[in-house]
Design a protein with these regions (language model features):
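N-terminal localization/anchoring segments of enzymes in phospholipid and broader phosphate metabolism
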Residues: 1-354, 358, 362, 402, ...
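Internal, well-ordered alpha-helical scaffold/interface segments
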Residues: 361, 382-385, 395, 412-416
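Thr-Gly-centered strand-to-loop micro-motif
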Residues: 370-371, 398, 428, 447-448
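Helical hairpin unit composed of two closely spaced alpha helices linked by a short loop
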Residues: 373-395, 399, 404
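Histidine/acidic-residue-rich catalytic or RNA/ligand-binding cores of hydrolases
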Residues: 379-381, 408-410, 440
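Catalytic-core elements of nucleic-acid end-processing and repair enzymes
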Residues: 436
């Protein structure tokens, strides 16, 4: 079944889509330039419109770097700048998308119940305040009695993931940004097909843009034909639209509501180092077992019910009553706490960024960070430098071999001020680092899908699993230190730049919020 997916015009679809968008851009530009040549009035109106958009942006409550980039662009392009911002500058999803998700989340509110918060508050009021903020923003509570296993590489997670899928008796939920047929995806979908044939309910969500060059356009039909319900999130069409910005970057696997997985991994062979793309691919995944899995299921079901044509989900049928009872009584609070949360572009609350900033503010001893990209706001940069200046051991690890050279150049442009403030920066020499992880003080960690870049922090649907006072946290710290032994520490001498290089970095900083 999976073999049929390979080589079926996926590259052709991406090429045709790109060409059609370019044709539209050229057509719009040609029409406007020709009209402007014959209309001084239109020229003046467009310039006035650009001024109005600039004033609107100045007063808008939005990320300062994002606003400044657009203001500079509109200053350089006084005729078309305002029009470009009107077409492409709004970070919010389409009204239809916003309404679909907001309505579904509103219906779901109150589904999740947990008795863990008072116990966390008793153990550590500062961690509890962060947990409270997350619950108030995402509607997902903190849970206890949830076992967490940490896999420090994709190939280590493969067999536990397959074993969990094989154990399914009621349902499997699977959501990924990228799915690319190969050994990894083939093995997963062979199990899914077998389970669907056995009567297990199987549902799959994939992001269409993430899979534009890897899956055929009839993938949904192929899955439905073998009993797997499938949702193509935000289909990518060759029409100029703001909606293309908002992607589903989450990674979720849930089995029977009892076991769940999340982390940085997608369903592609490079993630398990079956193939080599940019040297060794360093990623991670966590396995949850217990009441905390319900939040992963909730995020999946919210997305499904918001966008699937048939509203066919009753949340109660996906719950495990035994785990719900455990969530309320919390038999063993000493085993730590887990809180999965989702971040969305539907509001003006950059939840993921705020959580990262608060982790840096909470830390007293150390904060170790994995990130594939470093294209951050001034506020997050300040949180890192302030933590380092008050004596916290802040260490940041990025790839040694990049997947996107321009973004890697942007990443390195942030090194110098961080190093000057005392942040230690390492580049993973063997290859590409794709994990998105914070760990602090042996009592707090975050493992999920949220990169340190503008798209991840402001535009995408994301998730992360917060771990409070959990026994797995030292394992995450140990993984960072072991990986650090394979990395090269960056010094101030490494960040020296020529005048041309500094000018180029300045230009890249201007476009950073768009990347």
């Amino acid at each position: 079944m999976i073999k049929k997916l390979r080589g079926r015009f996926t590259t052709g679809r991406a090429l045709v889509t790109t060409l059609l968008i370019l044709i539209q851009l050229v057509w719009f530009a040609t029409v406007f330039l020709n009209i402007i040549d014959y209309s001084l009035v239109l020229d003046a109106l467009l310039r006035v419109f650009t001024v109005i958009m600039t004033l609107y942006l100045i007063r808008k409550n939005e990320n300062p770097a994002y606003r400044m980039s657009w203001i500079i662009l509109m200053g350089l392009l006084p005729i078309f700048g305002g029009l470009f911002y009107a077409l492409f500058g709004n970070k919010r999803p389409s009204r239809r998308m916003a309404a679909q998700v907001a309505n579904q989340v509103a219906k779901d509110y109150g589904q999740a119940v947990s008795g863990a918060y008072p116990h966390l508050l008793e153990q550590d009021s500062r961690l509890a305040s962060l947990s409270y903020y997350i619950e108030q923003t995402s509607n997902l509570p903190v849970y206890g009695d949830t076992q967490v296993d940490y896999y420090a590489a994709g190939e280590l997670a493969l067999e536990p993931l397959l074993e969990a899928l094989r154990s399914a008796e009621r349902y499997i939920l699977l959501e990924f940004f990228i799915m690319n047929p190969g050994l990894f995806m083939d093995q997963v979908f062979e199990v899914l097909a077998q389970k669907a044939d056995q009567g297990v309910e199987v549902r799959v969500i994939y992001d269409d843009f993430g899979c534009l060059t890897t899956l055929p356009s009839d993938f949904v039909a192929q899955m439905e034909a073998i009993g797997i319900k499938c949702l193509q999130f935000n289909p990518f069409t060759p029409v100029i639209s703001l909606a293309v910005n908002n992607r589903d970057h989450r990674k979720i696997v849930v089995v029977d509501g009892k076991v769940g997985f999340t982390g940085g991994m997608n369903l592609a062979d490079e993630y398990i180092n079956e193939i080599e793309r940019f040297g060794y691919w360093k990623d991670n995944l966590i396995r949850l077992e217990g009441p905390g899995v319900w939040s992963l299921a909730t995020l999946f079901l919210d997305m499904w019910n918001a966008f699937y044509p048939k509203k066919d989900i009753n949340y109660e049928t996906f719950k495990d009553d035994t785990l719900s009872e455990r969530a309320l009584r919390l038999a063993n609070p000493s085993q730590g706490f887990v809180q999965v949360y989702g971040d969305t572009p539907l509001d003006n609350e950059p939840l993921g960024e705020n959580v990262y900033r608060d982790m840096l503010n909470i830390a007293q001893d150390y904060v170790y960070i994995y990130t594939p990209y470093l294209v951050i706001s001034y506020e997050l940069q300040t949180a890192m430098t302030l933590a380092a200046r008050r004596g916290v051991d802040v260490r940041l690890m990025t790839p040694g071999i990049p997947d996107k050279k321009m973004v890697f150049r942007m990443t390195r442009s942030y090194y110098r001020p961080l190093i000057e403030a005392g942040v230690k920066i390492y580049e993973f020499s063997p290859g590409f680092l794709h994990a998105k992880t914070f760990v602090a003080d042996d009592r707090l960690a975050s493992v999920g899908t949220i990169n340190l870049d503008y798209r991840s922090l402001y535009l995408h649907f994301e998730l992360s699993a917060m771990l409070y006072e959990h026994p797995v946290i030292p394992t995450i710290k140990a993984d960072f230190l072991a990986t650090q032994a394979q990395a090269r520490q960056i010094t101030l001498a490494d960040t020296r730049n020529t005048l041309t290089g500094m000018l180029w970095d300045a230009v890249l900083r201007i476009v950073a919020p768009f990347v």
